[in-house]
A protein has these predicted regions:
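Conserved active-site aspartate in kinases
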Residues: 61
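A short beta-turn/loop motif at secondary-structure boundaries
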Residues: 39-42
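Short, extreme N-terminal leader segments that mark the start of a protein/domain
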Residues: 2-36
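Short alpha-helical segments and helix-capping/turn motifs at coil-helix boundaries
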Residues: 33-34, 44-46
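Vicinal oxygen chelate
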Residues: 2, 4-16, 37, 45-55, 57-58, 66-103, ...
Length: 136
């Protein structure tokens, strides 16, 4: 049986940037936001608001970097932020990504994030084209 769970939700930064946006949201949630790091392949950076059970809100903004113009995620974040920011999408973790690749007829793409402490996180993802066509 396929196991899946909500991993996090994504919120595009409002006009005053990811940090200020995340601080406002965190205050409403009774949480404390922290810098998440940079997505070099996407030309974005994020601020994390931790929630219960290892879930979180990711507040993301584009960087002034060519990757944000070329990567679908960077394009989606830029468009949503330029429209005032707000909820962008949600991320589901699955235990068998290959089954989802087969079901959708697409290969997952690599993603990574460099945290401020130097740790690099890596993952594979599907669905950015769908998010681009129909932002949440």
């Amino acid at each position: 049986m396929l196991r899946m769970r909500v991993d996090h939700v994504v919120y595009a930064a409002e006009q005053d940037g990811a940090r200020a946006t995340a601080d406002r949201l965190a205050a409403m949630l009774g949480a404390e936001a922290f810098d998440g790091g940079v997505h070099p392949r996407f030309g974005t950076r994020n601020v994390i608001i931790p929630l219960a059970d290892e879930r979180y809100v990711e507040v993301v903004e584009v960087l002034d970097h060519p990757a944000s113009d070329n990567a679908p995620f960077g394009q989606v974040v830029r468009a949503r932020s330029e429209a005032g920011g707000g909820w962008l999408g949600w991320v589901i973790e699955v235990d068998d990504l290959s089954a989802q690749e087969e079901r959708l007829g697409r290969q997952a793409v690599a993603g990574n994030r460099h945290r401020p402490d130097g740790v690099e996180l890596r993952w594979k993802q599907l669905g950015l084209k769908g998010l681009q066509a129909d932002p949440q």
